[in-house]
């Protein structure tokens, strides 16, 4: 799994802060989201962020009726096998407990993790939702083709 470019890595904290600040503007619209069907969702944070940074989205998903969980791997310190393996362990645990496929929601680098996990564990994953993830969009390597 290849990580984001150095430019994207360096600008991630700033981009995350901007995203969080726009949440305040979006709050009135969020009440129009229809209720979920109760399936499990695992949320994966972006680079240099931890599960604490995903609490707002997990709380929102829970309020909408989903079973939202954290990735439980601490701070996302980049592309590392131990973080990937740990996230897969949590995914397997959620699947075993619920008997349902799990949706993966990843913010920035977390979206790259989510996509890679889904590619390697498709029998456990319902869908992937990536938020601001730095995917390549040129030619056959485009995210729509992987």
Predicted segment positions?
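Serine-dependent carboxylesterase/thioesterase catalytic core
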Residues: 39-52, 56, 62-146
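Flexible, membrane-associating and regulatory peripheral segments of lipid-active enzymes
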Residues: 1-41, 51-54, 59, 64, ...
């Amino acid at each position: 799994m290849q990580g984001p470019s150095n430019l994207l890595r360096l600008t991630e904290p700033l981009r995350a802060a901007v995203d969080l600040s726009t949440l305040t503007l979006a709050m009135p619209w969020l009440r129009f989201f229809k209720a979920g069907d109760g399936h499990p969702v695992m949320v994966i944070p972006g680079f240099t962020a931890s599960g604490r940074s995903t609490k707002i989205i997990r709380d929102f998903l829970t309020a909408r009726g989903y079973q939202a969980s954290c990735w439980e791997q601490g701070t996302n310190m980049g592309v590392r096998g131990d973080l990937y393996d740990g996230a897969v362990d949590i995914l397997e645990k959620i699947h075993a407990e619920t008997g349902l496929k799990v949706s993966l929601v990843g913010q920035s680098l977390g979206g790259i993790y989510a996509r890679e996990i889904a590619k390697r564990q498709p029998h456990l994953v319902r869908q992937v939702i990536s938020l601001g993830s730095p995917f390549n969009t040129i030619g056959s390597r485009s995210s729509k083709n992987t």
